């Protein structure tokens, strides 16, 4: 359900909840990041379990996130910026892809949704918010 504006986000989540959707996957893009607090709150209000692509949504109350470690990406970008400032040509630098991903689980959100997170999932999480 693509929705990029606040009113459409609210409508989309209400529709999903009304259709008894089992859950929500929120991709890590600029629109969802801009409106992440609204999405987190609406998902909680509609009792929709959601997995987010950015850690920040889980920190703000979302159930869980799995995605690229943003800090690691910024470190890599800084190295590239340094190389360019030292004279290397940007077009000659190899393309790099994310290599570090993180799983963050919010147990408070899980409890509010009456979800028991399996111990095996907790064991592999990079961060557990209690």
Where are these regions (language model features)?
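Short hydrophobic alpha-helices and adjacent helix-cap/hinge residues
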Residues: 1-130
